[in-house]
Amino acid sequence: TASIFPNQMNLLSSDKWCEVATHPVSGQKRITSTGKVLNNARKIVFISTGESKAQMVRNIAVEAKPEYPASHIQPANGELIWLLDKDSAQLI
């Protein structure tokens, strides 16, 4: 799994396979795969549900805004799959 937050973009370029990430609001510690691992995966799946996620999905999937870590996940030789409900997909 991945928990790379905008305030920890350095985790995208880490040479380690996994790192400790800290949620920017709750401070919760999480183990995350790094960008290097994610971009070398055979298959990456982004899952999103709910209307509250619609703008974020658009920002990442359509506009590829660089301030969002998920915009940097582009598997080199793999497949990127989006699983969305109609509410989270309404702006794409």
Regions found by a protein language model. Give the residues of each.
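Conserved phosphate- and dinucleotide-binding cores of soluble alpha/beta proteins
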Residues: T1-I92
